[in-house]
Amino acid sequence: MGTASRAGIASARRIVVKVGSSSISGDNAGQIAPLVDAIASVHARGAEVVLVSSGAIATGMPFLRLDDRPADLATQQAAAAVGQSVLIFRYQESLDRYGIVAGQVLLTAGDLAAPDHRENAQRAMERLLGLRLLPIVNENDTVATHEIRFGDNDRLAALVARLVDADLLLLLSDVDALYTRPPEEPGARRIEHVGFGDELDGVEIGSTGTGVGTGGAVTKVAAARLAAEAGTGVLLTSTAQVHSALAGEHVGTWFAPRG
């Protein structure tokens, strides 16, 4: 049974945390440590956590001397091949402070579409969690084709939440919530709560202009609905507010689950 309301976040037993490229790469690479701090805190209270992390391409770009996200697939794949290993190293280096070991899980959309592949992924994930390890999931950008632009892993995070029957899906980006209009405009209001099945027209999640990720309001709302439909509560907020979010404080936009 998923987390039915914000009040249950602080006691959620199985949590999927998704973080976007722009939040943990480039000038924001320093946010990995506080993100790990927050994950370690809920891990210490006994919760099981899966981290879905974008950022392989963005992390690999400087090593290929690229200033902007490459447009061609082959260079994206090359950047991902380099960046994924660096990204996992950075996470593990930070996790070492808490004695937590990460397990890398690279998936494509096809892995979760085919029943036998999905069962294999589920079995591996359950075993990692049972061993008190931290699965770090990313799309396998080095071999993916059109999936490489697949909503900056928002949909993948929702599918992983369904796969492991998570209580909570925490979608992190570099803006704090959904808004009724662009948040920098006068009169913009934060949308605090979205009831299951509620219509959302014209919502905004802000713009970062970083050019390193592919997600936006549409992909995040679609992912939130996908997870909520399966009974998982969803909170959308900024990476900077991850501690407050996991403590159940009143931040971000809450998507109530079915039931």
Swiss-Prot record:
Binding site for substrate: 54, 141, 153
Entry keyword set: Amino-acid biosynthesis, ATP-binding, Cytoplasm, Kinase, Nucleotide-binding, Proline biosynthesis, Transferase
Principal localisation: cytoplasm
Reactions this protein catalyses: L-glutamate + ATP = L-glutamyl 5-phosphate + ADP
Subcellular location, record wording: Cytoplasm
Alphabetical GO biological process terms: L-proline biosynthetic process
EC number: 2.7.2.11
InterPro entries listed in its UniProt record: AceGlu_kinase-like_sf, Asp/Glu/Uridylate_kinase, Glu/AcGlu_kinase, Glu_5kinase, Glu_5kinase/COase_Synthase
Binding residue positions for ATP: 18, 173-174
GO molecular function: ATP binding; glutamate 5-kinase activity
Known role: Catalyzes the transfer of a phosphate group to glutamate to form L-glutamate 5-phosphate.
Entry's family note: Belongs to the glutamate 5-kinase family.
NCBIfam families named among the record's database cross-references: proB
Protein name: Glutamate 5-kinase
Organism of origin: Clavibacter michiganensis subsp. michiganensis (strain NCPPB 382)
